C-alpha cells in the first residue's frame, strides 16, 4: 500500500453501551487483515486500554489510553489535541497504519467527534436503556455515520420494542444507516465491519 493517512474511526456512546466490547470485537476480527491501533479515552484511568490489553485485542504498544480528566466529550470535540497527539504517536510508531479506532469516554447523547479527529463515526446505544433512546436524538443518534443499537437480546427483559427503535431510528436518521447488534454473540459485527471497509475504502490483505 502507498503511504497514506490511517482511517480514523470514532466509537462513541453512553457509559455501558458496549463501546469497548465493539472495539475489542473489531480488533480481533480485523487485526490479521489490516495494520491497526487504538486510542481509548477514560476520565481518570486507562481502564478501557487495560481491558483491551488484558483481552489481547492487539499488542500493548498498539493501544494508547488517554486520561481526559473532567468532561470526556471535550477531549473528542472542543479540544481534541490530547487525542490527536496519541494518533500522531501511533502513526509514527507504526508506519503504514491503516485503521486507528478512537474510543470516546462514556458520554451523553450530545457528544460528537471533531472532524479533525475522526473520519468515520460509530455511535453505540443499548436496548437496556429503553426503546425511547433513538427518539431522544442528539448528534450521536442523528449525525453519526453508523448507529449501532446493541444488546438486542435484553429487549424482552426490559420491555423494549425493537420495532419502535427501528421506526424511531429511521425517523431520526433519515438515510443514515443503523444496525441492531448483540456483540456478546457477534450478531451484527459482520455488517459493522462491511460498513467500515466500504465507507473507509479499505482493501483487506492477509496478515
Curated annotation (Swiss-Prot):
One of its GO terms (biological process) is urea catabolic process. One of its GO terms (cellular component) is cytoplasm. Its main location: cytoplasm. GTP binds at residues 13-20. Keywords: Chaperone, Cytoplasm, GTP-binding, Nickel insertion, Nucleotide-binding. The keyword Chaperone applies. It is found in: Cytoplasm. It comes from the Bacteria. Transmembrane segments: none annotated. Signal peptide: none annotated. Homodimer. UreD, UreF and UreG form a complex that acts as a GTP-hydrolysis-dependent molecular chaperone, activating the urease apoprotein by helping to assemble the nickel containing metallocenter of UreC. The UreE protein probably delivers the nickel. Facilitates the functional incorporation of the urease nickel metallocenter. This process requires GTP hydrolysis, probably effectuated by UreG. PANTHER family: UREASE ACCESSORY PROTEIN G. Belongs to the SIMIBI class G3E GTPase family. UreG subfamily. This is Urease accessory protein UreG. It comes from Azoarcus sp. (strain BH72).
Amino acid at each position: 500500500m502507498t503511504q497514506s493517512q490511517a482511517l480514523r474511526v470514532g466509537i462513541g456512546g453512553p457509559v455501558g453501551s458496549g463501546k469497548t466490547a465493539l472495539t475489542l470485537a473489531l480488533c480481533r476480527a480485523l487485526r490479521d487483515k489490516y495494520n491497526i491501533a487504538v486510542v481509548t479515552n477514560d476520565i481518570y484511568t486507562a481502564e478501557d486500554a487495560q481491558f483491551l490489553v488484558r483481552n489481547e485485542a492487539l499488542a500493548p504498544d498498539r493501544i494508547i489510553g488517554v486520561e481526559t480528566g473532567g468532561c470526556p466529550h471535550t477531549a473528542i470535540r472542543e479540544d481534541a489535541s490530547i487525542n490527536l497527539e496519541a494518533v500522531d504517536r501511533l502513526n509514527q510508531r507504526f508506519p503504514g497504519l491503516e485503521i486507528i479506532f478512537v474510543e470516546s469516554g462514556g458520554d451523553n447523547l450530545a457528544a460528537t467527534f471533531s472532524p479533525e479527529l475522526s473520519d468515520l463515526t460509530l455511535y453505540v446505544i443499548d436496548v437496556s436503556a429503553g426503546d425511547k433512546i433513538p427518539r431522544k436524538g442528539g448528534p450521536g443518534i442523528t449525525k453519526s455515520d453508523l448507529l449501532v443499537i446493541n444488546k438486542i437480546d435484553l429487549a424482552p427483559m426490559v420491555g423494549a420494542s425493537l420495532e419502535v427503535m427501528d421506526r424511531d431510528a429511521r425517523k431520526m436518521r433519515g438515510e443514515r444507516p443503523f444496525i441492531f447488534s448483540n456483540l456478546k454473540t457477534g450478531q451484527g459485527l459482520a455488517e459493522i465491519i462491511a460498513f467500515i471497509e466500504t465507507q473507509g475504502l479499505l482493501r483487506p490483505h492477509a496478515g
